[in-house]
Swiss-Prot record:
This is Nucleolar protein 9. Residues 698-714 have a biased composition (Low complexity). The lineage of its organism: Eukaryota, Fungi, Dikarya, Ascomycota, Pezizomycotina. InterPro entries: ARM-like, ARM-type_fold, NOP9, Pumilio_RNA-bd_rpt. RNA-binding nucleolar protein required for pre-rRNA processing. Involved in production of 18S rRNA and assembly of small ribosomal subunit. The gene is nop9.
Length: 722
C-alpha cells in the first residue's frame, strides 16, 4: 500500500496547521459573540504563577485584571473593530502622489497650495475613514488636517463623529484624531456663521455643529469607556491630547517636556511657504475654551479613576501606558484647577499620597520610594515634585528626599527627580543641597552623569548662591594639568592630523579616480555623542558663572595650542564651548586677546567648515574692542575670497563679516567694526552728533536769548529794534 505523500520542514508543518484551523473555523457555527469559557482551577494556578513571576521582576507593578474592571468599561465592539473598507489601487496611488507633492512643497505661494488641498479634499469626500485607517495614506490625512482652515476642520470633524470610539483605538487613525484635536483647539471659540444650509459644489451640506459642540459630541461618545481607554496602547496618547485641549493648555508634540511627546511618534512637519505665517506658535500657547469644557473635563477626570481602587490606581504609576495619562491628570489637577482640588480627599493626588506629611514609614513615603528608582514611575514623581503645592513639596523634601539628595543624584533614574527638586529649592535649601551633592561630584564626572552638576550651577546662578565649593569639587574631579583637564571635560581626543579639513572636500580619491572613500575620524556611536553633548553643556554652564568656575575653563583653553583649538572648533559639540568663551560676559579683554590670536592663520579652513564657521562668526563680536586683531582677520579672509564664495558656509561668513564693505568702503567698515553703528542704532530717537559749526551756532543762539531775557525797559526796546 503506497504511503501518503508528506512534505517535510517547519514551513510545510505551519501551512498544514493553518489549513486545519481554517477548516475547523468553516465547520463551526457563525455565532456573532463567542462564549466565555469558565477558567479551570489549573488555569487559575498557572495565571497566579505567571503573575508572581512578573511581580518578582517589577515589584511596584500590579497588573490590572480584566475581570475586576468596572462593568461597561470595556467597549462593546462585538468582537472586532469595524472595517471601513480599502482604497482601490487608483485611489491609493492618487493619495500617495498627493502626499509626495505636499512633502516636496514646491508651490509658488500659499494660495496655490490651498487650491491643491481643496482638490484633494474633494477627491477624498466620502473616503475620509478609509484614508485615516490606511497605513500608506493616514499621513496624508494628518497633513491635510494641519493645512486646513476652520471650515475644513469642521467638515472632517463631522465625518469622524460617531466613529471616534473605534478610531482612537486604531493604530493609524488615532494619530489623525490627535492631529485633528490639536489643530481644532485654536478655532474652538469661533462662532459658526448663521447661514442657511447650502450645498457646495460636491453636493455636500455644511455641518451645523460648531467645533465646541463637536468636542462635546466626542466626550459623549467616549464617556462610557474612559477607564478602558486609559490603558489602551493607541488611545491613551489621543486621550492625553483631548484632556489638554479641553483644559485650554498648550499641546506641543515637539517639546521634550510636553506630556504628549513621544520618541516613537513620527513628527509630521508642514514647511511654510511665501505668503504664509508659521502656525507653530499657536499650538505652544494657551487658548481660551468654552465654559462647558471645564465641567466636562472634571467629569472625565473623575470617571477615569472612579472604577479603580487605590491599589490599582497606584499600579498605574508604573504602567507604561497608563503612567503618561496619570501625569496629565495630576498636572491638570494641581496646576489648572488650583490648590483647592489637591485638598479634596477624592482627588487623584490624595488617593495616591493620602498622607501629606510624607514622614518616613507612612503610606505616602513608601509609595514615593517605590517610584524613585523605577524608569516609568520616576516620571510621575517628577510631575508631582514640579506641581505639588508649596507646603506639600516642603514636607516631601524635608521629611523624605532632602537628606538623600546626594545618593539620589548618583542614580541614573532618580537623578531626574533631583533636577526637579533643585528647580524648586530656595536659597538656603539650595546651599544645603549643594553641600550634600559636592562629595558625589567626582563620581558623577567619572560616570558621565553630568545633568545634576549642570542644573546645580544654573540654579545657583538664579538664586545667587556662591559656587566656589562646587568649583573646587569640579576641579578635584579633573586633572591638575590644564591642557589635559579640557580634554577630560569635553571628552575630546587630540588627533595626529592637526590640519583642519573643510567639509566641502571631505572625500579623498584613489589614483584611478574611481573609488572615493570618506576621510576623517571614524564614526561616533550614539552613546559617545550623548556623552560629548552633556559634557559640552556642562562646560558652557560653567562659563556663565563669574569667578573660579569660569576661570577653570578659561585657563584650560589658554593652555591649548593653536592646532588643538582649531580641532575643537571643528567638532560640533566642542565648538559651542568656544563660541560661549568668545562671547560670554565673563571673558575679559585680556582673555579674548590671547584666545583670538590662536585662530590667525586658520580662518579660511574654519570658515569652510559647518561647525568652524560659527566660531569665525563669534570672532566678530569677540574682537569688538580689539580692532587691530579684527582687521588682520578680515585681511586673511580677503586673501581667500574665491574659496569662501564657492562654499555655502563660506558665503555666510563673508556676509557676516561685511567683507564687501571691507573691500569697497574701508572707512565705513571700520566704523561698523568698532561698533559705532550699533551705538547709533541702540539710541533710537536720539539726535545725530552735531558738527562744530552747528555747535557754534547753538552757542550764539543761546547767548542771544540770554541777552534778550536780561534786557529791561528802554534797553529791551533797543534790543528788539536790532
Amino acid at each position: 500500500m503506497p504511503r501518503e505523500q508528506q512534505k517535510r520542514g517547519r514551513r510545510a508543518e505551519k501551512k498544514s496547521q493553518k489549513e486545519d484551523s481554517k477548516r475547523k473555523f468553516e465547520e463551526t457555527s457563525e455565532d456573532p459573540v463567542a462564549k466565555r469559557i469558565k477558567p479551570s482551577a489549573d488555569d487559575h494556578e498557572t495565571n497566579e504563577a505567571n503573575d508572581n513571576i512578573q511581580l518578582l521582576e517589577n515589584e511596584d507593578y500590579i497588573p490590572l485584571e480584566q475581570g475586576e474592571q468596572q462593568e461597561g468599561e470595556q467597549p462593546d465592539l462585538d468582537g472586532d473593530m469595524p472595517f471601513y473598507g480599502l482604497l482601490d489601487e487608483e485611489e491609493s496611488e492618487y493619495f500617495q502622489r498627493a502626499n509626495e507633492m505636499l512633502e516636496l512643497n514646491q508651490f509658488q505661494d500659499a494660495e496655490e497650495r490651498s487650491l491643491f488641498v481643496d482638490s484633494v479634499y474633494s477627491e477624498a469626500n466620502g473616503k475620509e475613514l478609509k484614508i485615516a485607517c490606511s497605513q500608506g495614506c493616514s499621513r496624508l490625512m494628518e497633513k491635510l488636517i494641519s493645512m486646513s482652515d476652520a471650515r475644513q476642520l469642521r467638515r472632517i470633524f463631522s465625518k469622524f463623529i460617531g466613529h471616534f470610539l473605534h478610531l482612537v483605538q486604531h493604530r493609524f487613525a488615532s494619530h489623525c484624531c490627535e492631529t485633528l484635536f490639536i489643530h481644532a483647539a485654536p478655532a474652538v471659540m469661533q462662532k459658526t456663521k448663521s447661514q442657511p444650509k447650502r450645498s457646495d459644489e460636491e453636493g455636500e451640506e455644511e455641518p451645523e455643529l460648531s467645533l465646541a459642540d463637536m468636542f462635546m459630541a466626542v466626550i459623549e461618545e467616549l464617556k462610557e469607556n474612559w477607564g478602558y481607554l486609559l490603558t489602551e496602547r493607541f488611545a491613551s496618547h489621543t486621550i492625553r491630547v483631548l484632556l489638554l485641549v479641553l483644559a485650554g493648555e498648550p499641546v506641543d508634540v515637539t517639546s521634550n517636556e510636553s506630556f504628549v511627546a513621544s520618541r516613537k511618534k513620527e513628527r509630521i512637519e508642514i514647511p511654510t511657504i511665501q505668503g504664509e505665517e508659521k502656525a507653530g506658535k499657536s499650538k505652544a500657547e494657551k487658548h481660551t475654551v468654552p465654559e462647558t469644557f471645564e465641567p466636562a473635563l472634571k467629569k472625565i477626570m473623575t470617571d477615569m479613576v472612579a472604577g479603580l481602587d487605590d491599589v490599582y490606581l497606584r499600579a498605574l504609576a508604573t504602567h507604561p501606558v497608563g503612567n503618561p495619562v496619570l501625569q496629565v491628570l495630576l498636572f491638570l489637577e494641581l496646576s489648572h484647577f488650583g490648590k483647592s482640588s489637591a485638598k479634596d480627599p477624592k482627588s487623584t493626588i490624595r488617593r495616591l499620597v493620602p498622607d501629606e506629611s510624607f514622614e518616613e514609614g507612612s503610606e505616602s513615603a513608601v509609595f514615593i520610594s517605590g517610584l524613585l528608582y523605577d524608569a516609568v514611575g520616576s516620571r510621575l514623581l517628577e510631575t508631582m515634585v514640579r506641581y505639588l503645592p508649596g507646603k506639600s513639596f516642603k514636607n516631601l523634601y524635608r521629611n523624605n528626599l532632602g537628606d538623600r539628595i546626594g545618593s539620589l543624584s548618583r542614580n541614573s533614574t532618580a537623578g531626574y527627580v533631583v533636577l526637579r527638586m533643585l528647580e524648586r529649592l530656595g536659597k538656603d535649601d539650595l546651599k544645603i543641597a549643594m553641600a550634600n551633592i559636592n562629595p558625589e561630584v567626582p563620581g558623577l564626572i567619572e560616570r558621565s552623569r553630568l545633568i545634576v552638576p549642570k542644573m546645580l550651577i544654573e540654579r545657583c546662578m538664579v538664586r545667587g548662591v556662591d559656587t566656589k565649593p562646587l568649583a573646587e569639587a569640579l576641579e578635584g574631579a579633573y586633572s591638575k594639568d590644564p591642557a589635559v583637564r579640557l580634554q577630560q571635560m569635553l571628552k575630546f581626543n587630540i588627533s595626529e592630523n592637526t590640519a583642519p579639513q573643510s567639509e566641502d572636500h571631505d572625500m579623498e580619491e584613489d589614483n584611478d579616480g574611481k573609488d572615493r572613500k570618506p576621510r576623517g575620524p571614524p564614526p561616533v556611536s550614539a552613546a559617545e555623542k550623548a556623552e560629548k553633548l552633556h559634557a559640552s553643556l556642562l562646560v558652557q554652564a560653567m562659563l556663565t558663572v563669574p569667578g573660579p568656575m569660569s576661570q577653570l575653563v578659561y585657563t584650560s583653553l589658554l593652555a591649548q595650542s593653536s592646532e588643538t583649538i582649531v580641532q575643537l572648533a571643528q567638532e560640533p559639540t566642542s565648538s559651542r564651548v568656544l563660541q560661549q568663551a568668545l562671547t560670554s560676559t565673563t571673558s575679559t579683554p585680556q582673555i579674548r586677546r590671547q584666545l583670538t590670536t590662536r585662530f590667525q592663520g586658520y580662518l579660511t579652513p574654519l570658515a569652510l567648515s559647518s561647525s568652524g564657521s560659527h566660531v569665525v562668526d563669534a570672532l566678530w563680536s569677540a574682537t569688538k574692542d580689539i580692532f587691530f586683531v579684527k582687521e588682520r582677520m578680515a585681511q586673511e579672509l580677503e586673501q581667500h575670497e574665491q574659496e569662501l564664495r564657492d562654499s555655502f558656509v563660506g558665503r555666510a561668513v563673508w556676509r557676516n563679516w561685511s567683507m564687501d564693505l571691507f573691500k569697497r568702503r574701508r572707512r565705513d567698515w571700520t566704523h561698523k567694526a568698532k561698533g559705532f553703528e550699533e551705538r547709533t542704532e541702540g539710541n533710537e530717537g536720539a539726535e545725530r552728533p552735531k558738527s562744530k559749526i552747528e555747535q557754534a551756532r547753538a552757542r550764539y543762539a543761546a547767548a542771544k536769548e540770554a541777552a534778550d531775557a536780561g534786557a529791561t525797559g528802554a534797553n529791551q526796546t533797543t534790543v528788539a529794534s536790532r
